[in-house]
Amino acid sequence: MQRLVAVIAQQFDEHPGNYLAFFSSFAYLKSAAALLAEGRPDIPQWRQEPRMGTDARAEFLARFRPEGQGVGFAVLGGVFAEGVDLPGSLLIGAFIATLGLIPVSVTQDHFQARLDKLFGAGHGYADLVPAMQRVVQAAGRVLRTPEDRGWLWLLDDRYRRAEVVELLPAWWQLDAARQPGASPP
């Protein structure tokens, strides 16, 4: 987790602005936010909380102001990962620190087994495709208009797997070796 927080801090230092950081759970989100706050208390941050009401959601989104700076921590697949419009400088980048897979459960295992029996690719249909839909949806918070440019950090080693890469949009310019400091394409 130190590496993940270091990437967030370095990207923020090199390109100050508004960012969203997405995590697989509230526990993971809380741990990462606490680590960033401990090591870099100068970086403003705000967090999605479980069961946020309308007013709390509005307050979270109000933190994204033109020429603002900070990191909003949210859960991938949650209320801030889709249906949120933050064009231009309201949001200049996102960090996705998870592949977004559905948690293991008996129901999910049965669904995957059924799809595997029918199509021979149960894991892909039941797990990977929905996960990548959530990732693309969250990434879409950064690019809201044709003029928007920004950074998207996929901070999970599983994004290097061929079966995952082939599910990402073809127009994404992927650079597995890119480090903080680069300009957006």
Enumerate the predicted regions with their spans.
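ASCE RecA-like P-loop NTPase motor cores
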Residues: 1-185
